[in-house]
A protein has these predicted regions:
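Catalytic domains of riboflavin
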Residues: 2-183
Length: 183
């Protein structure tokens, strides 16, 4: 699952889970001359700690670059490719779909989901992790086609991040999956 932040990126404390040491092949992210993404160096226990790595990730996201964030082994034990919705481009979405599961989720505050009338996807959530999926969505109008293309999904993400966008600008169901953010 790939998560996209719909709120502007602020400086805040973030807890990072253990990371894999070394390099990860990727295209389109900040890379070295060989096209390899350099991951932060982990300590002997596999943790990347410290404000410096968090600040570097936030700076990258402000520039519109995706960042890999891993969760705890007792959660999903996976990495998520995250980026700011306000900076979404067709290229970022194409890369994300090509190099991940292709499921694009967008983390949003509950208040904003309520404003956009994006309620829970199901009445009874049976997800073992309790992931709070909202009704999937696409942007309406403009140059939108079916909603599935990288450019359509980028437009939808930017619209979800736009505080001026209203509920009538979206159709349900769609190809992006909002998640109700929890503290």
């Amino acid at each position: 699952v790939n998560r996209v932040l719909s709120e502007p990126i602020a400086d805040e404390t973030i807890s990072l889970a253990p990371k894999t040491r070394g390099r990860m092949p990727a295209i389109g992210l900040s890379t070295d001359a060989a096209g390899t993404v350099l991951m932060p160096e982990a300590d002997e226990d596999g943790w990347c700690l410290g404000r410096e790595s968090v600040e570097a990730a936030l700076d990258a996201m402000r520039r519109g670059e995706p960042v890999v964030v891993t969760d705890d082994a007792d959660r999903e034990n996976e990495g998520d490719l995250i980026f700011a919705a306000e900076t979404a481009t067709a290229e970022t979405l194409a890369f994300t779909v090509r190099h991940t599961s292709g499921v694009i989720c967008v983390a949003m505050p509950g208040e904003r989901l309520d404003e956009l009338r994006l309620g829970p996807m199901v009445a009874r959530n049976e997800d073992p992790k309790g992931t709070a999926f909202a009704v999937s969505v696409d942007l309406l109008g403009g140059d939108m086609t079916t909603g599935i293309s990288a450019s359509d999904r980028a437009r939808t993400l930017r619209a979800l991040a736009d505080p001026e966008a209203t509920a009538d600008k979206f159709c349900r169901p769609g190809h992006l999956f909002p998640l109700r953010a929890r503290p």
